Every structure is written in C-alpha cells, then in structure tokens.
C-alpha cells in the first residue's frame, strides 16, 4: 500500500503503534487466524486498532500481517471503520522479530525521542490507560512493557526437568504487550541482533524486551497490565 507514516516534525515526538497480525493461531483449532475471529460482533484485531486509533497520544499505526490478509485488513478494518491512523500495512516476516522489524522499517526517519509501541493484535483488551502509561514510561526509561504479577509458583528447571530454582513470586511477572521503546534504541538493538545472527548467534528471541536486553544492554521497566490482556490463544 502507498500509505505513508508522517515524519518527525521539529521537536514534536511522534508516537507510532506497530500492531502485529501475522500469526496463524496454530494453538487454536480454527481454520481462521485468531486475530480475525469474531468476538462480540467484531474481529479480534478490530479492538486493538480501535484502542490505538482513538488514543490522542498515538500519531500513527503500522499494521503487520500476512500477504494474503493485506486486502482484508485494508478494506474490512482500516477503511470500514475509518481508522485514520492506520498509515501503512506491511507484510510480516518469518519470525515475530522479523515482522516487528518490517513495521519498524516502515516508520522511516525518526526523531531521537520518537516512541514506538509494539502490540500483539490477538490481545484485544488493551486500554487507553495502559497505552498512556507505556508512552510515559518509555519516554522516561527508554524501554518498558506491560505485565502482570505471576499468580502461579514458577520453577526454573534444567535440561532433565529437575527444578533448580524457585524465584520469589513477587519478583515474577508474566509479560504482555504493548512493549514500548524509544525508536532509535529499538532500531539499534535490531541492527545488532541481525549482525549477531549473521555471525552465527542462535539465541531464541521471543519478544522485544528480550531483544533490547540482549542486544542493547537496556533493562525494561514493567508497567502494570491486566489478566484480561492475555492472548486469546
């Protein structure tokens, strides 16, 4: 598509949401990708797009999906509901981090203080409060994520599945999205990661907080989420 994300204007901080909708939902016994399943009269992805589109602190949305879903996202979501902030629809990559990088590349030139929120489109219950808290935290700390305290006891196990450590539950959080970063920091972490992978790095990267910790040496602060924000599977 030929939609363009606005560039940084002077000292104004631009805030972009990258919404990931390239998954196929292999854990759900459904022929339809989970982000397009209907919940309360709308597709799951609709709710995330609406939350970011309506938030006054978000300037634009980049939606990342599979090639076969681009037209559907354009016509049945962005145009049908007049989500004016959806400025680009990108085709995702092989891994989750590849899809994020596609979205990041679509943002274009960034100001040094610009912010990007990365959100899983299969988490429909993101709130305006979570978005606001994430933007504020990333502006201050550089990197943050939404998360909730773990309700279950967590065990660290070895390769033989014997427990080797039981962390105190008050220090254990289940990490959700959005995950929010200063754009230059995240871009730098991605460039370092891809360079490392070209040189044989085999780390399994499961989310962007891990990527930033591993390849930029930056700790991510946790913003309080909600149990309802879980992925719908």
Question: Where do the protein language model's features map onto the residues?
Answer:
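Acidic helix N-cap motif at the loop->helix transition within catalytic regions
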Residues: 71-77
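Conserved beta-loop-beta/alpha segment of the NTase-like Rossmann-fold superfamily
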Residues: 88, 94-157, 176
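Short helix-capping segments at alpha-helix termini
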Residues: 55-57, 79-85, 109-110
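Short, low-complexity intrinsically disordered segments enriched in A/P/G/S/L with frequent Arg
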Residues: 4-9
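Conserved alpha/beta core of the MobA/IspD/sugar-nucleotide pyrophosphorylase nucleotidyltransferase superfamily
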Residues: 174-233
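N-terminal glycine-rich phosphate-binding loop and ensuing alpha1 helix
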Residues: 13-71
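Short, flexible, basic/aromatic active-site loop/helix in glycosyltransferases
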Residues: 155-181
């Amino acid at each position: 598509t030929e939609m363009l994300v606005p560039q940084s204007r002077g000292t104004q901080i631009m805030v972009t949401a990258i919404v990931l909708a390239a998954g196929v939902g292999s854990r759900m016994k459904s022929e339809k990708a989970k982000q397009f399943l209907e919940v309360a009269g709308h597709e799951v992805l609709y709710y995330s797009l609406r939350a970011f589109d309506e938030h006054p602190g978000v300037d634009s949305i980049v939606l990342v999906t599979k090639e076969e879903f681009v037209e559907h996202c354009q016509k049945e979501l962005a145009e049908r509901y007049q989500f004016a902030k959806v400025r680009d629809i990108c085709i995702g990559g092989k891994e989750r981090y590849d899809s994020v990088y596609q979205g990041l590349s679509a943002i274009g030139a960034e100001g040094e203080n610009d912010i990007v929120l990365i959100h899983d489109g299969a988490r429909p219950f993101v709130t305006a409060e979570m978005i606001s808290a994430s933007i504020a935290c990333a502006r201050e700390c550089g990197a943050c994520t939404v998360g909730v305290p773990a309700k279950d006891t967590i065990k660290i196990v070895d390769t033989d599945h014997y427990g080797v450590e039981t962390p105190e539950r008050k220090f254990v959080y289940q990490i959700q999205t959005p995950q929010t970063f200063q754009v230059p920091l995240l871009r730098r972490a991605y460039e370092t990661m891809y360079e490392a992978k070209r040189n044989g790095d085999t780390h399994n990267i499961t989310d962007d907080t891990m990527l930033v910790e591993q390849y930029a040496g930056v700790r991510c602060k946790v913003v309080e989420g909600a149990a309802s924000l879980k992925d719908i599977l």
